[in-house]
C-alpha cells in the first residue's frame, strides 16, 4: 500500500474532519481519480509521434493509455474527424496513490525554475488541474530514448465540495503551493 494512502487514512481524515467539522468520515474529501492527458497534435502528420507519446505515457502512468480522437474536422488545424490527436490515462485505486506519491516526492521537485504550484488552478469544486511542460521530470522516462519534449495535463479529481476543502486535502499531502 502506498505511503500517502496510509497517511490519508491515519492522519489526514482526522485532521480534515476536525478542521471542517464533519460528523462522518464519509464527508471528508478524498482523491477519487487522477487523469493524465497528453495532446499530440503533430500525430496528424507523423504516426510515429503517437507511438512515442503512448510509450512515454505508459511508462509514467503504469497502465496503457487510451488514444483520443478528433470529434470534428477542423480545416485550420488540418485534422479530420476520427484522427488520433492525443492520449489519456485515468488512474484510480492503488496506482493513483503510487502516482501521486511519485508526483509530489520526485517529479515536482525536478521541474526547472520551480517556485510552487499555483493555488488558483482549482475549478470551484475542489478539483485541481496542473500542466507539466516536460515529461522528463518523471524518473521512468529515459532522456536518451525520447524523441521530443512533450507536456501533459494532470487533473486531480476530489470529492471536495469547495476549493478550500480541496486545497486543505492537497496541502495535507505536502503539495508545494505558492505562499
UniProtKB/Swiss-Prot annotation:
GO MF, one example: rRNA binding
Signal peptide positions (record): none
UniProt keyword annotations, A-Z: Ribonucleoprotein, Ribosomal protein, RNA-binding, rRNA-binding, tRNA-binding
Database matches in Pfam families: Ribosomal_L5, Ribosomal_L5_C
Gene Ontology cellular component list: ribonucleoprotein complex; ribosome
A single BP term in Gene Ontology: translation
Keyword Ribonucleoprotein: yes
Job of this protein: This is one of the proteins that bind and probably mediate the attachment of the 5S RNA into the large ribosomal subunit, where it forms part of the central protuberance. In the 70S ribosome it contacts protein S13 of the 30S subunit (bridge B1b), connecting the 2 subunits; this bridge is implicated in subunit movement. Contacts the P site tRNA; the 5S rRNA and some of its associated proteins might help stabilize positioning of ribosome-bound tRNAs.
Protein family per UniProt: Belongs to the universal ribosomal protein uL5 family.
Complex formation: Part of the 50S ribosomal subunit; part of the 5S rRNA/L5/L18/L25 subcomplex. Contacts the 5S rRNA and the P site tRNA. Forms a bridge to the 30S subunit in the 70S ribosome.
HAMAP family: Ribosomal_uL5_B
NCBIfam families the UniProt entry points to: PRK00010.1
Name listed for the protein in its UniProt record: Large ribosomal subunit protein uL5
Source organism of this protein record: Shewanella sp. (strain W3-18-1)
Amino acid at each position: 500500500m502506498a505511503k500517502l494512502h496510509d497517511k490519508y487514512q491515519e492522519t489526514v481524515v482526522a485532521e480534515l474532519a476536525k478542521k471542517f467539522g464533519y460528523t462522518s468520515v464519509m464527508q471528508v474529501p478524498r482523491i477519487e481519480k487522477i487523469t493524465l492527458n497528453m495532446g499530440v497534435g503533430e500525430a496528424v502528420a507523423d504516426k510515429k509521434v503517437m507511438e512515442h507519446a503512448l510509450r512515454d505515457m505508459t511508462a509514467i502512468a503504469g497502465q496503457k493509455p487510451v488514444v483520443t480522437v478528433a470529434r470534428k474536422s477542423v480545416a485550420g488545424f488540418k485534422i479530420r474527424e476520427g484522427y488520433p490527436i492525443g492520449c489519456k490515462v485515468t488512474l484510480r485505486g492503488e496506482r493513483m496513490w503510487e502516482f501521486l506519491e511519485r508526483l509530489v516526492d520526485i517529479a515536482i521537485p525536478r521541474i526547472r525554475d520551480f517556485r510552487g504550484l499555483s493555488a488558483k488552478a482549482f475549478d470551484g469544486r475542489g478539483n485541481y488541474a496542473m500542466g507539466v511542460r516536460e515529461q522528463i521530470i518523471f524518473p521512468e522516462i529515459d532522456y536518451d530514448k525520447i524523441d521530443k519534449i512533450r507536456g501533459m495535463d494532470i487533473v486531480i479529481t476530489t470529492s471536495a465540495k469547495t476549493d478550500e476543502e480541496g486545497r486543505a486535502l492537497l496541502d495535507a499531502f505536502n503539495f508545494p503551493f505558492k505562499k
